[in-house]
Design a protein with these regions (language model features):
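Short phosphate-binding/catalytic loops that engage adenosine nucleotides
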Residues: 88-90, 167
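N-terminal helical cap/lid subdomain that shapes the substrate entry/recognition surface
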Residues: 1-88, 101
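Asp-based, Mg2+/Mn2+-dependent phosphohydrolase catalytic module
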Residues: 83, 99-100, 104-202
Length: 202
């Protein structure tokens, strides 16, 4: 939906540096399946950060806010595809690892918030995308059959979670996901962007 994965490539290290600390691992990989709150706990336990979980989450969000407000864009073809889905009576919602206020604001700025009945965030659900809870909550909101409810994901681990739970899946290319071959192999459909004509056949 949003071309925003680039933000999370280095934010873990950048936040530590803002506190005068250096990471001793690839935090992108470490944090891949964690919620922001879980990542904050990790900072506290493994890097001796004395701030509260809320203070850490607020600090990370403050660092990404400006990027979301100015640089994050829609993935190619998504605006037209959402309009087509809406015209054809397809219900849609969002399931995201990003905090609600950032997603709400960005979708409004990009003119697509009205397409979605609801936004579900990992923070509010209480589980990351390594668990299927967020997809199950979204399914409940949509009121559709699981077999007819497609999960679009550009992260391999998240798509694997949805597929393992029985959802049909669409893998979406993202240059920041290094496991493209695995994503393509695992997904029921795989697209480079949202201009792919196969989307109107699903």
């Amino acid at each position: 939906l949003l071309d925003s994965m680039f933000i999370w490539d280095t934010i873990g290290e950048e936040y530590l540096r803002s506190l005068g600390k250096e990471s001793h691992e690839d935090l992108k990989e470490t944090f891949m399946t964690l919620t922001l709150e879980e990542a904050a706990e990790y900072y506290r336990e493994h890097y001796g950060v004395s701030l509260s979980v809320k203070e850490i989450v607020d600090g990370v969000n403050a660092m990404v806010e400006q990027t979301y407000r100015t640089k994050v864009t829609l993935k190619p073809g998504i605006a037209e595809y959402l309009a087509w889905l809406k015209e054809n009576g397809v219900r849609m919602c969002v399931a995201t690892v990003t905090d609600r206020y950032l997603v709400e604001e960005t979708l409004e700025r990009l003119g697509v918030r009205h397409y979605f009945s609801e936004i579900f965030t990992c923070a509010e659900v209480g589980f990351g995308k390594d668990k299927p809870i967020i997809y199950q909550k979204a399914l409940e909101d949509l009121g559709t059959e699981k077999s007819d409810t497609y999960v679009f994901e550009d992260m391999l681990f998240a798509l694997n979670t949805a597929k393992t739970d029985g959802f049909p899946t669409v893998g979406v290319y993202d240059r920041h996901e290094v496991h493209q071959d695995e994503l393509k192999e695992l997904s029921d459909y795989y697209i480079f962007d949202f201009t792919d004509p196969i989307l109107k056949t699903i």
